[in-house]
């Protein structure tokens, strides 16, 4: 694959929301069931009363951002819906949103961007408020009612957003979403949202959950075919040959990546190259490209969780709680509690044994490879070389 193609895949990976709507739709090859489930609900909903709000959950790279963008574009392009329903697609990272008020301010700004004639005055009015979230929502609500319109807000990294809101703001947002039909929320999160599972939290059992599971063999083939089409006719022929003649190579990569689409896209070139000598060189290049994804994944963790992940990743093979505690010098109870959270964040898998001493392993093996290549010794890197030979 030429450099420009590699670059285009890179953009698709990390800047999905900046891609042209038609290009994104053309490359939308997986997560179709999840898309149809939510899209049909949006289509049939009149929002005469408060509608169901969704939370899309999945590990980083599972396809949440692409799915949210696809839904937002579809609302905007639907002739019937777009007359009264305005899609508000927030950026994957919204560093300017620090409170519920700034959340409403950002929505007012996006409304003004999409329809300056109707909503510029709204944005100006909200901008002049003194940090009052209640007044900000009241203004937005009134302007929407006056224009006989409603909004559907697509929020990636909803968990990060919730962390910045205090308890009062959580309660206020819950009240708005529960009682006001002018707004609907479709969120995404790369970790299980504690607010949804905490019985004492305002958002307990509030969202309809959509879990993005690892893609299966058929979906893997669809993704590879889509990538090949974007690359060229020769790539289409090559990938079809591999699917027919070497399905085991594709299955090995799927298991290695735990079926995470973003990582599979990055490994596309290695799959195409097969048993050529350049395979290991491509692996090194791919390791470098996965750094933004995996470093972000590590940054999401607490200090104790990072230490536990480090111990398991450096070991490669599964470890017991006792072994992890010895390596990290953390109390066994602390390790056990953090392992539960790491499983909820899809970082670690539990391997049950016949005893109480269960084993724990890094769930996505390619993440473990990245960790060894980035932080391991020469011996660790030789392990990766052997693995590459195995894939060939």
Predicted regions and their residues:
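A short beta-strand-to-loop transition that corresponds to the Sensor-1 phosphate-sensing loop
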Residues: 72, 157, 187-193, 215, ...
């Amino acid at each position: 694959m030429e450099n420009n193609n590699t670059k285009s895949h890179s953009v698709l990976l990390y800047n999905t929301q900046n891609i042209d709507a038609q290009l994104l739709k053309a490359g939308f090859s997986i997560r179709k069931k999840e898309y149809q489930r939510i899209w049909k609900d949006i289509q049939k909903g009149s929002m005469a009363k408060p509608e169901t709000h969704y939370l899309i959950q999945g590990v980083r790279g599972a396809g949440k951002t692409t799915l949210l963008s696809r839904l937002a574009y579809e609302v905007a392009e639907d002739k019937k819906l777009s007359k009264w329903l305005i899609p508000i697609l927030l950026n994957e990272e919204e560093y300017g949103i620090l409170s519920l008020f700034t959340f409403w301010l950002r929505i007012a700004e996006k409304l003004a961007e999409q329809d300056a004639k109707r909503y510029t005055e709204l944005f100006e009015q909200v901008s002049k408020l003194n940090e009052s979230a209640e007044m900000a929502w009241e203004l937005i609500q009134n302007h929407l009612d006056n224009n006989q319109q409603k909004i559907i807000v697509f929020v990636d990294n909803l968990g990060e957003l919730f962390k910045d809101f205090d308890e009062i703001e959580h309660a206020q947002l819950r009240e708005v979403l529960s009682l006001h039909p002018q707004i609907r929320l479709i969120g995404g999160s790369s970790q299980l949202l504690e607010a949804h599972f905490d019985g004492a939290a305002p958002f307990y059992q509030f969202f309809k959950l959509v879990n993005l599971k690892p893609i299966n063999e058929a979906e893997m083939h669809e993704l590879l075919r889509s990538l090949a089409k974007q690359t060229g006719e020769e790539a289409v022929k090559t990938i079809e040959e591999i699917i027919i003649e070497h399905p085991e190579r594709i299955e090995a990569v799927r298991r290695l990546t735990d079926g995470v689409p973003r990582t599979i896209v990055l490994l596309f070139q290695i799959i195409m190259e097969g048993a050529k000598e350049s395979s290991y060189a491509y692996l090194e290049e791919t390791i470098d490209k996965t750094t933004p994804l995996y470093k972000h994944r590590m940054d999401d963790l607490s200090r104790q969780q990072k230490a536990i992940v480090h111990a398991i990743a450096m070991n490669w093979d599964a470890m017991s709680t006792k072994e992890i505690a010895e390596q990290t010098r953390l109390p066994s109870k602390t390790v056990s509690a953090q392992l539960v959270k790491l499983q909820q964040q899809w970082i670690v898998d539990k391997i049950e044994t016949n005893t109480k001493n269960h084993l724990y392993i890094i769930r996505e093996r390619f993440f473990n490879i990245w960790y060894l290549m980035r932080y391991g010794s020469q011996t660790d890197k030789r392990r990766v070389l052997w693995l590459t030979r195995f894939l060939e």
